């Protein structure tokens, strides 16, 4: 082959390899969208501990909480889908307009704390243990970007205790205190921020129908008082969807795990302090995670049953529940069927 043809061929090969490498690199680059990927459900034993609880007997059964791995999807995945039972989630479906990933992480931490409080109340009360829920302050779970408080140093998850030295423990008390201050007036807030008590100064804003607002979405922060102490040891997991699992662990530990009859019970679902189970995201991926640990039963919110069954292998029985009591009954039925 003439020398110039060899050089031309080599140049063509190099160009093809370089182009292919560039395309491959581009496809593996992160997109702005997210991927939900299945994770094996995790045991609640060791995560939730009740004072005085005994070690579960062998073959007693176990409760598992289901989680979903969340990461940025690659460009390839936005075109061709997420492998191994994963799901592509558009950016706008996970983040609100103007919300950063750091904001979402803080909200997920707040939601996890709230789920633990609800689980403690529901689980202990189901055991007949007295529980008192004491209002503590007003937690910030949303901030209007254009409101003065957005540039005051306050962050999502902060808890407001005082408005101009007036103690506030509920959202109603916050509204009353702000009404006293008046609209578009300076106001001093004492709040729990980054583990410390801090004082900041901001301005109120006019709300609808003559109301006075801070420009935040408030949620009541509470203190749980009970003679039976419950502790949680968990890192790297956020969100509200483990509430049902945590309550079941508290109840099962209190019953010596006899209520499980040897079953592996995986669960997902938000939980209110009244025992209502609410919907969650990623039910299909969580069903796969339940199967990975050999779960006999997968309890999900009623609103997520179809999605969970679509993702669950035949080896896992999926049951929808509306309340914590429903969950206990579902476990009992599974042991007698």
Which residues fall in each region the model found?
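Hydrophobic membrane-insertion alpha-helices, especially the h-region
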Residues: 6-25
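PDZ-domain C-terminal substructure recognizer with occasional recognition of PDZ-binding tails
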Residues: 127, 175-218, 310-336
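Conserved PDZ fold ligand-binding element
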Residues: 149-173, 177, 287, 294-298
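Short, ordered loop/turn segments at secondary-structure junctions
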Residues: 164-166, 194, 271, 302-305, ...
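Glycine- and Gly-Pro-enriched alpha-helical subdomains that act as flexible
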Residues: 253-258, 265, 271-302
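Short, glycine/polar-rich helix-capping loops at beta-to-alpha or helix-loop-helix junctions
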Residues: 299-311
